[in-house]
Regions:
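Membrane-proximal helix-turn-helix segments that form the acceptor-binding/catalytic region
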Residues: 99-120
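Acidic anion/phosphate-binding donor-loop and adjacent secondary structure
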Residues: 132, 148-163, 168
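Conserved donor-binding/catalytic core segment of Leloir-type glycosyltransferases
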Residues: 163-181, 187-194, 198-200
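Aromatic "clamp/platform" in nucleotide-sugar-dependent glycosyltransferases that forms part
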Residues: 254
Length: 342
């Protein structure tokens, strides 16, 4: 069975966790074998149609593509992500807005795309609830499959990082530079306590002003041993080694679903400091350290506490790519009408 993985955005125009997940899903499925091969979607390639499509997220511009897939007689699977939509009130409001667009404004769009899917995948239980409430997806069509983490992060060594940048301890933050991820607040708090911060990630195209503010803060942090690497890719050994070498990992996002960078840090058994945003209610993050505020003085205190007394974390093996690939294979076979192996 051939499976085509459709990323959220073209790889050449956008970077981020979902693009990484699309690439890694292909690699993991091809490594698994067992009658399934995977490829990334290409707008220009002319080949026989695959047996099934898997859309990793569903931005509006991909809705038309789901219609074409359906017309071609191929099933598709959707991964739905809802980010900060949590709580009964917010879910009901989102469901009402969706109903108005679909039924009063005659703009069914995403609603039809979701209902036409052979299966819906969510990466958290909260997103499974959101899919049911907002889109009316029956629980039997929803499959909970978490993000996968490359097994290299479980056994990483600091040696590559030490050879390139020395063995001084540092705070690590990985992710595309954007306001919702809070890198500026983190850099300013590190500067207040003179803690070296290593930022890994590019500035998103529409976040130039925020990127300039982060650059100014990191210029100050460089006096304390910090640095910013903008072009490190997920498959780079230096990224794995940075996780192994850091004193602890920090991500102060106000909105996420299940951030891959945090899971990579947990796989490396590193202490993690998060801003207590709604997504952190997930049981996966229950044992981590938190800052309750991004107010500079109190946030800096949280940094200092973890720096002085780091507490290691861990990640369960069910988040490894082989395990995720096996679960996806079962979903794909069922969607194509094939009975999975028992």
């Amino acid at each position: 069975m051939r499976v085509c993985i459709v990323p959220e955005y073209p790889m050449s125009l956008m970077t981020g966790g979902l693009q990484v997940q699309a690439e890694e899903t292909c690699r993991a499925l091809n490594a698994l074998g067992e009658g399934v091969s995977a490829e990334l979607f290409s707008w220009s390639e002319k080949r026989p149609l695959p047996d099934l499509y898997h859309f990793v997220s569903l931005p509006p511009y991909l809705v038309r593509l789901t219609e074409l897939v359906r017309c071609a007689g191929r099933p598709y699977v959707l991964t739905l992500l809802f980010g900060g939509v949590r709580g009964t009130v917010r879910l009901r409001r989102a469901a009402t807005r969706r109903w108005i667009r679909a039924h009063l404004l005659r703009q069914p769009g995403r609603s039809d795309a979701v209902q036409g899917a052979a299966a819906v995948v969510t990466i958290t239980q909260a997103d499974a609830v959101a899919a049911e409430v907002i889109f009316g997806v029956s629980p039997g069509r929803i499959h909970l499959v978490p993000n996968g983490v490359d097994e290299r992060f479980f056994r990483g060594s600091p040696e590559v990082w030490h050879r390139a940048h020395g063995d001084a301890p540092f705070v690590l933050c990985v992710g595309a530079i954007q306001k919702r991820k809070g890198q500026l607040a983190l850099a300013e708090a590190c500067n207040q306590r003179r803690l070296p911060l290593v930022l890994l990630g590019p500035v998103l195209p529409d976040e130039a002003a925020y990127g300039q503010a982060v650059e100014a803060a990191m210029s100050v942090n460089s006096r304390h041993g910090g640095l910013w690497l903008r072009d490190l890719r997920n498959e780079d050994d230096l990224l794995v080694s940075a996780h192994a070498a850091c004193r602890f990992f920090a991500l102060w996002s106000v909105e996420e679903t299940q951030p891959l960078s945090v899971m990579q840090a947990m796989a490396a058994r590193k202490p993690v400091l998060l801003f207590r945003a709604p997504y952190t209610r997930d049981a996966l993050f229950s044992g981590l350290a938190f800052t309750e505020t991004l107010e500079p003085d109190r946030a800096a205190e949280a940094l200092q506490r973890l720096w002085d007394a780091p507490q290691p974390t861990r990640l369960d093996s069910r988040f490894t790519w082989p395990e995720v690939a096996r679960r996806l294979r079962t979903i794909y076979l069922t969607a194509c009408g094939t009975k999975p192996d028992v």
